[in-house]
Amino acid sequence: MATRPGPLTEWPWHRLGNFKYVVMAPVVAHGARRVMRNGWGDLDIAFSLILPSLLLRMIHNQIWISLSRYQTARSKHRIVDRGIEFDQVDRERGWDDQILFNGLVFYAGYLAMPSVRRMPVWRTDGAVVTALVHTGPVEFLYYWFHRALHHHFLYSRYHSHHHASIVTEPITSVIHPFAEHVVYFILFAIPILSTIYLGNVSAMGIVGYIAYIDFMNNMGHCNFELVPEWIFQIFPPLKYLIYTPSFHSLHHTQFRTNYSLFMPFYDYIYNTMDKSSDELYESSLKGTEETPDLVHLTHMTNLQSAYHLRIGIASIASKPYSDSAWYMWTLWPLAWLSMVLAWIYGSSAFVVERIKLNKMKMQTWAIPRYNFQYGLTWEREPINDLIEKAILDADMKGVKVISLGLLNQAKQLNGNGELFRQKYPKLGVRIVDGSGLATAVVLKSIPSDAKKVFLRTGTSKIARAIAIALCDRGVQVIMNEKEVYHMLKSQIPENRASYLKLSSDNVPQLWIVHNIDDNEQKMAPKGTIFIPISQFPLKKLRKDCTYMSTPAMRIPEEMKNIHSCENWLPRRVMSAWHIAGILHALEGWNMHECGDEMMDIEKSWSAAIRHGFLPLTKA
């Protein structure tokens, strides 16, 4: 929103929210009526292209979003090295509004101008006219309109909304108040109306021109330099006809320079080109290699989780993951396709996120596999190979710590990472499974006045540590798993072993659990508090019970470039396993935390609090 919003700031369908696509219902109804009356042959090319062209534009923009986020996380060609936060993602989530607006206006034009219904697929002379009119009137008028928008009166009421994003993403290009988009559409309609008037309009000419506008808009705001220098060396005048991402980035950081639409020609003429444009272009193209201090290794969970990655769909990634959202079901075909492609071609981990905490740099890498694949016996070796390759890559780059998230540290897969430590005893990178901090978070979430807890956690080292700590605290730990009970009993000091009890009666209302099925949840007494020790949340089956979060903490304000949620966790909340790796790097701890090794629980907790991480709940 602009600093002082003026008239026509909001889109007409703003209050419809996610149901805004209903505004295209007249177009769908029109097409359906014609098909039912006269068959598919009654649809001319002009009408047939309206809806498909809108869909293609959305796909085009999404490709740019994913590409930009991937490149800015890993590439040395990043232009503005600052973070993006959730407020920017929320502000820019309506990037498809202008596509719907264009669709409605094109439909209105189709109804108002019968001559366009007979236009051919392609006219070369029409394409030439479009190019000439854009280069002349459109670029000229846009330049001066843009300069007018930077006058205080219009800037504070309209254009400041766009400039709220100093670090740009491709979709920043279309984040403007509705009134601005009306003017932009009029400008971009000039070449199209010119070809209609001259009689050389064509379907592909219109679609191609809109695609050109989208491409240049997205490229100019992608925040990484990709235009090769050899293009300008072969044809030097091109620097006046095509801007670069670094050229337009200066407009967002300096505000009073580089006003041109796509062609810097007018900035050269009117002396508004930023003097550092060439220098920034060259430095961005050259780039600077950087090595993260920490790499957190994650993976996709279910099929739809690919959209929840930071490089997926921005608005979905900015919210805690939920597979119950109705619109997610429409993406199932693409989800299946992405899974198959990842399974076949996913030969290494890929970068999905880049985070900074003061001077420390962190990256998140994803193994291109899904939850169900980790449970397949024949997939264990290939998955371990992928994890091993990621560890060795991190080691070769000089990364200090690599933390294993989700199932990448599964005991049945690699013994909580012990497999890699044994295989490569001279590793420079420290392998961290985060068990010490995860244990601390669980223990700190248990009320201090608790006298009894029910433990249903299996035999993991986190479960052992929790049982030992609770018995040492004088808390009665009740279990109903005989084999697990005897295993834990042997590891608890004799003077505290009496606090561990095998019983199925008088189960308390405080349950510490790993993975329990529906039947076990139904057995819990009313008012039970479930505290999970797993990285995966429990299914919330009971409305009369309380479900605590998986072990996690709130991150400090100093942590930047956080604009996506970690799986199902709320905004600016991070799993204990991820935080453990950060602490390992910050503190310079030299030990591996994998296999049976575990960081001291109190030491991990104290370090987390000292560095600004906060508990989600107070015991």
UniProtKB/Swiss-Prot annotation:
* Fatty acid hydroxylase domain ranges (all copies): 138-272
Q: Name one Pfam family in it.
A: FA_hydroxylase
Q: What is its EC number?
A: 4.1.99.5
Instruction: Indicate where this protein resides in the cell.
Output: Endoplasmic reticulum membrane
Q: What residues form the membrane-spanning segments?
A: 45-65, 94-114, 126-146, 178-198, 325-345
Give the membrane topology. Multi-pass membrane protein
Q: Which GO terms describe its cellular component?
A: endoplasmic reticulum membrane
Q: Name one GO biological process term.
A: response to cold
| Family (UniProt) | Belongs to the sterol desaturase family.
The task this protein performs is described as:
Aldehyde decarbonylase involved in the conversion of aldehydes to alkanes. Core component of a very-long-chain alkane synthesis complex.
* Subunit comment: Homodimer.
| Name by which UniProt lists this protein | Very-long-chain aldehyde decarbonylase GL1-4
